[in-house]
Amino acid sequence: MVENDSIGWYVAKTYRQERKIKDLLARMGIEHFVPFHQVVKEINGKRKKVEEPFVNGLIFVRGNKKSCIELINEYGYPMRYLRDFSTRSLLRVPDKQMEDFIYLVDRHENEIELFPHDLKRGDRVRVVAGTFAGIEGELIRIACHRRVVVRLENLFSIATVFIPGGYLEKICDR
């Protein structure tokens, strides 16, 4: 299959226009993911709950390469697509990584943390029990606690809260 015809998750960058682009994509019926979360901020001396992007400036668009590029070229969306460092082609996130990322951000926002993408790689693991059952990622230690990291290659990683060792199984490399 030609790369332009294959459907996948592409990653775009924008500057402070996540909500606008999210709304535009929704109106056009384009599958996308722009995660937001609630934070408490002090505004004019008062503490208020506000919604802000979970990952500043990033927008995930599902489609083929051609349709994604058309959003910029034909519709003038204020964003640009990130490129894979090694191939220089548009950065595409594998479906399983994206499914796990969406699940964690949508359902467990208060139990995850965002980390830079350059974490030291550990064993590949799958969570087999508990809240995060089915999630695959890398086993790491942060502050002496076992956590599973879901890595979006070349972007960032998110880590679960502590996971007991009995809830994990090692995934053999293929």
Regions found by a protein language model. Give the residues of each.
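Short coil-to-beta-strand transition motifs
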Residues: 121, 128-135
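Glycine-centered loop/turn positions within well-structured domains
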Residues: 146
